[in-house]
Amino acid sequence: MKFVDEATIKVKAGDGGNGCVSFRREKFVPFGGPDGGDGGDGGSVYLVATHDLNTLADFRFQRHYEAQRGENGSGRNMTGASGADLEVPVPVGTLAYDAETEELIGDLVEHGQRLLVAQGGFHGLGNTRYKTSTNRAPRQSKPGTPGELRVLRLELKLLADVGLLGLPNAGKSTLITQVSGARPKIADYPFTTLYPGLGVVRVGPLQSFVMADIPGLIEGAAEGAGLGIQFLKHLSRTRLLLHLVDVAPADPAEDPVAAVHTIEAELQQFSEDLASRPRWLVLNKIDLIAPDERESFTKELVARLGWEGPVYAISAATGEACESLMQAIMKYLEEAQSHDADTATAG
């Protein structure tokens, strides 16, 4: 079972600056010697691992990265400035392959780790370098070399940040489709996986997270019939659970409160660790409740449940309030990550 996010990007290092052909020209110095300076080195391209990213979603919007070229040399033996290196942030855990040869260039496993993926071009030489005892006025110089051009395939094992709970008719797959398909603010992203209930949600530049449906909780999951060990491992870093409830079931006899209790009991039996994660109540299909009745309906349902955590009312089908829910999730995940970082520093 593979949960893999992939992206293909093109990286181009900066070309080296050219050397200069120049001669010293001053009053009373009729035969000034060569004074052409060297060019500057081209900038290189590095991938830099960061905990601030969870997915490769941003590479859907920018696929080409180019470092600065070196400046040309000039007279008076002035050397051209070197081009600035370009650092491309990627999530920790990213594997970088050469797309043409499939050679593994590197595995970025630590925050702050840098991986050289395209070497900058070397500087050219000015004509000063070619002065000899027999050639006092060389008109020869050397151009800079081109920077390396490479197509990379980036691969990242996806781990779910947010898990979805709920009965089969609660609208989990509809929500994943809605939030990973509403462009441009929350963009769909083609990733390869054998598991369909997984979505990369892009909230904004450098802001994305992975949402996963937790399947089969009702069908004997506590006895191991539903989730396998691999999928449990996949959910190991889930920071937040969204508990989806169908507030307008097709069968009026179905009680949303009973549906919540059913899932809670099964979850507790299935995994105490997962059951202890923070959980938000998401009331789905709110569009089927009359607008003037929604507030009282929500209050009554929350009171019957004795629910004290966050509550959101949405419509996965129409997209109503979905974006604000995704923004709230992103904020929560960023704050949790920041808290973890502070704790690690203090420890």
Curated annotation (Swiss-Prot):
Disulfide bonds: none annotated. GTP binds at residues 166-173, 191-195, 213-216, 284-287, 315-317. The keyword Hydrolase applies. Residues 1-159 form the Obg domain. The keyword rRNA processing does not apply. Its cofactor is Mg(2+). Signal peptide: none annotated. Its main location: cytoplasm. Keywords: Cytoplasm, GTP-binding, Hydrolase, Magnesium, Metal-binding, Nucleotide-binding. GO terms for molecular function: GTP binding; GTPase activity; magnesium ion binding. Pfam families: GTP1_OBG, MMR_HSR1. GO terms for biological process: ribosome biogenesis. Residues 160-334 form the OBG-type G domain. Residues 127-146 are annotated as: Disordered. Residues 129-138 have a biased composition (Polar residues). Its EC number is 3.6.5.-. An essential GTPase which binds GTP, GDP and possibly (p)ppGpp with moderate affinity, with high nucleotide exchange rates and a fairly low GTP hydrolysis rate. Plays a role in control of the cell cycle, stress response, ribosome biogenesis and in those bacteria that undergo differentiation, in morphogenesis control. Belongs to the TRAFAC class OBG-HflX-like GTPase superfamily. OBG GTPase family. PANTHER family: DEVELOPMENTALLY REGULATED GTP-BINDING PROTEIN-RELATED (PTHR11702), MITOCHONDRIAL RIBOSOME-ASSOCIATED GTPASE 2 (PTHR11702:SF31). This is GTPase Obg. The gene is obg.
